[in-house]
Amino acid sequence: MNRTFSLATFISAVCCSGLLLGAEPNENFFREQVAPILAGKCVRCHNDAQAGGGLSLTTAREALSGGDSGESIVVGQPDSSFLLDYLVGEKPEMPKGSPPLSANEVSLVRQWIAAGAKWPHDLTLEVKDDWWSQQSLSRPAVPSVPAAFQASVRTPIDAFVIAKLDEQGMHLSPPADARTLVRRLFYDLTGLPPTPQEMQTWTEKLTAPDSSGINDEAYTQLVDHLLASPRYGERWARHWLDVVKYADTCGYDKDKLRHHAWPYRDYVIRSFNQDKPYARFVQEQIAGDALFPGEPDGILGLGFIAAGPWDFIGHVEVPATKIDGKNARNLDRDEMVSNTLNTFCSVTIQCARCHDHKFDPYTQQHYYGLQSVFAAVDRADRVFDLDPAVEQKRQSLVAEKQNVASQLVAWQQEIQAAGGNQLAKLRQQISALHGKTRPELEVPEHGYHSQIEPVAHVEKWVQINLDHPIELSKIVLHPCYDDFAGIGAGFGFPIRFKIEIAANPQFENAQLVVDETGHDFPNPLLGTYQAETRLTAQFIRVTATKLAPRKNDFIFALSEVEVFDASNRNVAQGSVVTSHDSIEAPNRWRRSNLVDGRWPQSLDPAAVEQLVSARAQLAKLERQIETPERTSRRKQLEAEQQRIDQELGRLPSGQMVYAAATQFSAQGNFKPTGGVPRDVHVLHRGNVTSPLEEAIPCALPLPGQETAQFSLPSDHTEADRRAALARWITAKDHPLTWRSIANRVWQYHFDQPLAGTPNDFGRMGQPPTHPQLLDWLAVEFRDQGQSFKALHRLIVTSSVYRQTSQHNEAFAAQDGSNQYLWRMNRRRLEAEEIRDSILSVSGQLDLKMGGPGYYLFALEKAEHSPHYEYHKFDPSDPASHRRSIYRFIVRSQPDPYMTTLDCADSSQSTPKRDETLTALQALSMLNNPFQLVMAEAFAQRLESEANTLDDQIDHAIWLTLGRSSNETERREYATFAQQHGLVQLCRVLLNQSEFVYLD
């Protein structure tokens, strides 16, 4: 009987004697030494289900059979075995995505092969399923520390770190001095430098009465003072926005502006300042409209789903039925899914889009199940109200509208079933012909366009003055072509209309030429409507009595009206045109375009005729299958829809936020779902042209859970899907969520996370250096109110945080990356901190909070493909002197100055910023126009606040470095200022390493 062993079980298994190696190595060698290596490092990619390179290492037979490259194991010949080739070298190919085997592990495998590669035939290796981040979360016991270090234990954090250091033969560095701690806390918690007065006040308070160290009570008071500052939310919101890819433009080719993205940014700032519980913060960003109806933050938080890049061309200009359109929408949902799981759970679920995850236990079914959670939402401007009563009413009406939309979809499905194959074939024929009716070339001057109306039964007219009476032979109407709302050919052509002629502009005693007011006239597409007459007239009027539908409104539009005389000459061209009303939007729409001799003509006139015929057949069939009961039901639903729209229209206009939305104004091919989820299928190799089974809304499998699927009723709404996901993520027993956020907060205080890959807690990521500390922090945060401020307080009051950043030669030789935290990490200020600090010390910083972002560029061609011209911007503009978190962030053309200083790239998630040191940074800090303008402002401030040059220098050092100047600085800076001027000295002072680095 064969046995199957996991790594945990086979270590203790007893293997059959005689099947193992002989005395050297002994019979337990494979079981105890080699099998754990193969199971822990290799079997995940080389197993029966997923044999990477054609090689499985689960059994002796499969391992010795080899793979695509030949014999991976040549018995007795390690140097001829491909297996070892992949495991050795400076950069071993295997294990892929994981740390290489140690020299000792490679040696053990080599010994095993050399000794005969014996493997018990009844021993099967399985994937080790005990990855650290997947394990249930519980509070570890706080370790004890040696008596010599007990005085340094201020918080449980210290005990965990000191115990780990002691294991390595190291210890904490001495505590930092008061000035260093004040500056460190101000920047970490607010992102701004302390003023000279703040530095002096708090340094004095922090200094113990006997000058023996730091006054702990005063230190805690400073921490609480900074956490209560509104500047705190601005600082910590910036970290969050880095991760979620926030920007004020869409990215991709056209990089359109998002005028209403900023309310989400302000929501994040406000949430941090309010110390909102983390579970609530998460739930608002995924399903706030469903879980907290009527509350503005429930809408504002949904800006998270819309924060990332968006393909304008792929959604607006390309139909959803085209491959590029399908790809755009698939990738858009991919971004929503990956951003959600990367941010909140540190899971790289996007790796399962084209195939099952290579390293983590997630399948394509899980991935596309998550896509289906977001299948009804798009990124768009949506209305919200600060008045909770109005917001609740609006959300109630939107929910009603979604319900009606669902019933209309069901009605359409009923009609489709009743029409059978004939209806389906006609619709397919019409869809195929529609693309052939595009105009031969786009005409920018479309024609005449009436004002927009909320209902169809409104009269609109347009008339032509021929200047004098003329005997007529024919009147020809040419339809428009416009892709707005996906309409295309026949845009705005009236459903019911008439043509009249008269001798006077008042149309007294008018004569009727054509009357199409008794029935609905089919859309002529790009065909013409011709009316013959032998009457004489000076004025010709076309009157629409039933307007053409757009999206939730109605219009009357014509591209051209030709009027032919008896000699077949168009006498209307260039005539005077008047109308009941007109939108007059040159060059696109205006009255004069109606008689300019230009109109769209189809590439395939025969296709137009076929399409008109097919539509007539479709209309006839629909009249047959739409029974009186069905007609009555449709009209009731349409009336209900109109009532809801009218009630929504009567509500206050509200404010706008760019967020996840199911209701918004259509733009070209970009249309709202109305709350009805799109069909999402598992895609073979991620190919939109190869759909497989329909995806079922789900989460991800976790240990101890029987299923990842949500328990949703059959009549659930799209918001129910998002609510289920939000609840799953914030469940108390979720092992990933609480570890993820604790790791992020730790990282921003120490400039390095406990788990080195904050967005990836899977097997491709790095395990934590202090796993028990991470678990303790996660449980403490989760169980003590989920308060960010409490977690900050716990971390920054620890001795680990309060130690100096001074170098220790011996410890650095042992732990050069400081992963065991034997000192505080020194870091360069982030780009926003540098810019804000320069504004602060120069006296130019405007602390106004919230509102639309300010430009650091000149904006050109905003309506098509915006150009963001940074070199044309004047940095002396006071509107740009606010904190950097409020700047307008562009994806495709980021600010060169901020990018040089390693600012986050908003086109991708930035869980940890790079810190580089380049010549370009030095050049920018010295010569960028912003630096020059601020140096002048800094000099003016010094001259206004200090009289003598020595006092100005000392004041400048206090402002930039938070200390008094020394004798050498006063002497050398005075000499420099006398030779080159105070402004040039200020340029130098703003480039000091001590100014831009934090100890």
Predicted regions, residues:
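Short, solvent-exposed loop/turn and secondary-structure capping segments
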Residues: N47-Q50, G54-L57, P95-G97, V106, ...
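Aromatic, loop-rich ligand-recognition surfaces of beta-strand-rich domains
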Residues: V443-N509, N523-Q624, R643, A719-A723
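Solvent-exposed helix-loop boundary motif
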Residues: G22-R110, A114, K118-A163, R179-R184, ...
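Active-site histidine-acidic residue metal-binding/catalytic motifs
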Residues: P95, Y252, Q274, G308-H446, ...
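Bacterial N-terminal signal peptides
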Residues: A8-L19
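Extended surface/linker regions that mediate inter-domain or inter-protein docking
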Residues: N215-Q364, L370-Q371, E647, Q786
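Short, surface-exposed tryptophan/glycine-enriched loops
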Residues: V268-F272, L341, L525-F539, E780-R782
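Primarily short, surface-exposed interaction patches in extracytoplasmic proteins
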Residues: F149-R184, D188-R231, Y246-P293, V404-S406, ...
